[in-house]
Curated annotation (Swiss-Prot):
Keyword Cytoplasm attributed: yes
Gene3D superfamilies (alphabetical): Anticodon-binding domain, Bira Bifunctional Protein, Domain 2
This protein's GO CC annotations: cytosol
Species classification: Bacteria, Pseudomonadati, Pseudomonadota, Alphaproteobacteria, Acetobacterales
Family statement drawn from the similarity comment of this UniProt entry: Belongs to the class-II aminoacyl-tRNA synthetase family. ProS type 2 subfamily.
Assembly information from the UniProt record: Homodimer.
A single MF term (Gene Ontology): proline-tRNA ligase activity
This protein's name: Proline--tRNA ligase
Length: 440
């Protein structure tokens, strides 16, 4: 993408309404534009990040056999009345009527719809277990939307659901999802600590939140320093091995970690003082086991091994995809701007031509741009001062900057800057491209 033609409206000044770093930087870097309170348009660079996160989520869900579906944003109120939640859900649920005066709602969550899908399709224990997920926009009418996409009214969520024959199977599904989430967050370039959490309006009796540590987090968190040493990739665990799942679960839950809602002061203070950690955290994922709460309410049954009808055990598993964009920025930025992990950056590299119109600079910049790939490089071909180009590249947070000036172009060399470390080295074009490729 050539920056001279790109819809990336960077801002020099910080918008007055932006209170936290991610909101400021997303507006300044041209990732989003506010359209109404808590509602944002995602501009091209922001959408690239959103799609990169969603694709990593999809990849890890496929790895555990979860099937992608797409459920409607507008749902029937009758289905929610059947579950008993239509009247119980608060004013954050947007209710509406169609032209025939039928009650509808903009779905804040999807337990009812997914259960309705499966009750019509799955009839026997032989068809279980099942896992399905979607990545879909939701709306919750927050009374005070704030902090940009961190707490907006419209947001993109990954919702996953499991259906199992019995409790043991449901716990196995819960653990498989937890392991897949650890791998997902590792690939997104963040550490997300699973912490005991409240089940909230979804219900259930087993729940973990996945928390990214950040000074602006909405929750106070308490955890064991052992979490600083855990292999977050889960690479040594096989999701299809019950023994590995048990070992993984004990590794994760064997150390104290809780949000303020579930904090056990006595258990925390039983830790050696040197291992006690506190901080602020941002919730980026939440998983629940809630048994037969919805399968009973919606009368979903399957024939068991003995022919008797039974209600499947269910779980619900969410990742805030749009919120993750803001959470990553909160955890990874500096005074100059965003510092994107390589895996979700809108562009792998910025190509900075410091002297537009110079034949050697133009030729080298075009060559580097095309060899990185026009989908993966942002070529700053604007007629701007070098300082403006450097500032915008730092603000937008590209993992690499390839700087091309007259002296270097004459010698066949470029300056390569790593955004995360600030390291600058002068290299041949071949060596610079090799470094960029190795980081992907």
């Amino acid at each position: 993408m050539r920056l001279s033609r790109a819809l990336i409206p960077t801002l020099k000044e910080t918008p007055a309404e932006a209170q936290i770093a991610s909101h400021r930087l997303m507006l300044r870097a041209g990732l989003i534009q506010q359209e109404a309170a808590g509602i944002y348009a995602w501009l091209p660079a922001g959408l690239r990040v959103l799609n990169a996160i969603a694709n990593i989520v999809r990849d890890e869900q496929a790895g555990i056999g979860a099937q992608e579906v797409l459920m409607p944003t507008i749902q029937s109120a009758d289905l929610w009345r059947e579950s008993g939640r239509y009247d119980a859900y608060g004013p954050e649920m947007l209710r509406l009527k169609d032209r025939h005066e039928r009650d509808l709602l903009y779905g804040p969550t999807n337990e009812e719809v997914i259960t309705d899908i499966y009750r019509h399709s799955v009839k026997s224990y032989r068809e279980l277990p099942q896992m399905a997920y979607q990545i879909q926009w939701k709306f919750r009418d927050e009374i005070r939307p704030r902090f940009g996409v961190m707490r907006g009214r419209e947001f993109l969520m990954k919702d996953g659901y499991s259906f199992d024959l019995d409790y043991a199977g449901a716990v196995r599904s819960y653990r498989r999802i937890m392991l897949s989430y650890m791998r997902t967050f590792q690939r997104l370039g963040v550490k997300a600590i699973p912490m005991l959490a409240d089940t909230g309006p979804i219900g259930g009796d087993l729940s973990h939140e996945f928390i990214i540590l950040a000074p602006t987090g909405e929750s106070e968190v308490f955890y064991d320093a052992a979490f600083e040493e855990i292999d977050w990739s889960g690479a040594s665990f096989n999701v299809d091995s019950d023994a590995d799942l048990e070992r993984f679960f004990q590794t994760i839950t064997g150390h104290y970690a809780a949000t303020d809602e579930k904090h056990d002061t006595a258990a925390y203070e039983a830790l050696p003082e040197a291992r006690r950690r506190t901080g602020r955290g941002i919730e980026v994922g939440h998983i629940f086991y809630f048994g037969t709460k919805y399968s009973k309410a919606l009368n979903m049954t399957v024939a068991g091994r003995d022919g008797q009808k039974l209600h499947p055990e269910m779980g619900s598993y969410g990742i805030g995809v749009s919120r993750m964009v803001a959470a990553v920025i909160e955890a990874s930025h500096d005074e100059a701007g965003i510092i994107w992990p390589d895996s979700i950056a809108p562009f792998r590299a910025a190509v900075l031509n410091l002297k537009n119109g110079d034949a050697a600079c133009d030729a080298m910049a075009e060559d580097v741009y095309r060899r990185i790939g026009v989908r993966h490089a942002l070529y700053d071909d604007r007629d701007e001062r070098a300082g403006v180009k450097f500032a915008d590249a730092d603000l937008m947070g590209h993992p690499w900057q390839v700087v091309i000036g007259p002296r270097g172009a004459a010698a066949g060399r470029v300056e390569l800057k790593r955004r995360r470390t600030g390291e600058r080295v002068e290299l041949t074009v071949e060596d610079a491209l090799a470094r960029i490729r190795e980081s992907v």
